[in-house]
Amino acid sequence: MSSTNNRIPMPPRLRRQDGAVRRLGVELEMQGLDIDALSALVAEHVGGEIERVSQYEHVVRGDGAGDWQVELDFAYLKQRGRDADPDDSVLGQLDGAAEELLAAGSRMLVPMEIVTPPLPMNELDRLEALIDRLRDAGARG
């Protein structure tokens, strides 16, 4: 694929000194879609498979460019999700309830984020097509 008509401004040189195509990693932040919907959309778009790291963090694997991260843009909750260890004690249940309350509020205020792998600059039309699909699905931002 080549990006001759893309909306993303291109630098004057698309190749490095060694002749390889320069790459660009991108973070897209948005509201309007939950992590499951975003992950499914990204996986379908790139032909990948979803790996659920936690309820706040997914990885889409299988794209030749690398892994795509789909996550709630809140480091504290992502770490909590990774460290989750079921605790049936009263304090553990209280802690879990507090996390769920924080997560519910965060989903209304904190954006979801898609982090791309380093994409070849001459293939950024793939990213533009994904952005169009996200908008069509209800993403805002």
Identify the function of each model-found stretch.
Residues S2-R140:
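ATP/Mg2+-dependent ligation/transfer catalytic cores
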